[in-house]
Amino acid sequence: MSLTTLKLATKKKDLCLRAVKGHFATSHSHMNYYIDITMQKSRLSEAKSIAHEIVSSYRSNTIVDTVLCLDGTEVIGTCIADELTKEDFANMNAHQTIYIVTPEYTSGSQILFRDNVVPMIASKHVLIFAASVTTGLTAKAAAEAVRYYGGKVA
């Protein structure tokens, strides 16, 4: 079965949405459209554009020490950290830098952090960034893991 991708323009010239109409099922939900963000997760110019838009919500009121990247969003997470540490941003963390981390998962899909990553979570303000939040279960699990390891969700 061939799927047709719809390319939708946005207000940003270097950023577009790619959507596929159909029936898509996960273990917890069913959807009629799939928004493909593969390019945004992989292409630096699009990742930078997304990060710039996202950071505008966090510029003056949120402390971010660590970006927790879910669903392969490390490129965007790195761009978010870059935006948050630019000179025109009032960075509230002590080292003027931001950690970018990804979790590991147990065989039961529980999120865990190895001993070498725990210091980047414990006592830190952690921004959780996910490619998709359909039911909220993954976001909830990530927030619980951050709190379990002694971090605060930003």
Residues covered by each model-derived region:
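PRPP-associated nucleotide enzymes
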Residues: 1-154
